[in-house]
Amino acid sequence: MTLVVVDTSVWQRRLQPSVGVPLGDAIESDAVAMVDPIELELLRSAWGSKDHDQIREEYSVLHRIPLDAEIGARAVEVQSGLARRGYHRGPSVTDLLAAAAAEAAGAELWHCDRHFELIAEVTGQPIRRLGT
């Protein structure tokens, strides 16, 4: 299975069978990668320090794609491409960085968020929309 970066929108809907089944299969296949901006979004939901630590531990088993200056520069470049189309205010900074990291790693990006479809129109990178 190809390495996949899983957006926050997928993690939040993981209890829906149309999302959870493919996500579970990818996790079992050791094909899921995490990027810091997505992890930070997920950790915002922690109820306190203990919950925060538990969530971090759950995601610690996933592959990591570190962010670097090239990924940051690519995110800015993609945002510029979106601006030329009038869509630069849609995708968040997290979306742009996650997409750039996935692209750099040659990973597919899984989402439940239409912003990634806009990003992929600029980048041509592989994405997969899960859920309904």
Segment roles from a protein language model:
Residues 9, 41, 96-100:
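Active-site phosphate/pyrophosphate-handling residues
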Residues 11-12, 39-42, 72, 116-117:
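A generic structural signal for short hydrophobic patches within well-formed alpha-helices
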Residues 49-53, 83, 126-130:
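Short, hinge-like loop/turn segments at secondary-structure boundaries
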Residues 1-3, 16, 99, 103-132:
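Acidic, PIN/NYN-like endoribonuclease modules and their adjacent C-terminal/linker elements
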Residues 64-112:
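Active-site neighborhoods of divalent-metal-dependent phosphate/nucleic-acid chemistry enzymes
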Residues 7-8, 38, 112:
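A secondary-structure boundary/capping signal
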Residues 1-34, 43-57:
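Short, well-structured N-terminal submotif of metal-dependent ribonuclease cores
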Residues 50-63, 68-70:
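Active-site-proximal, substrate-binding regions of enzyme catalytic domains
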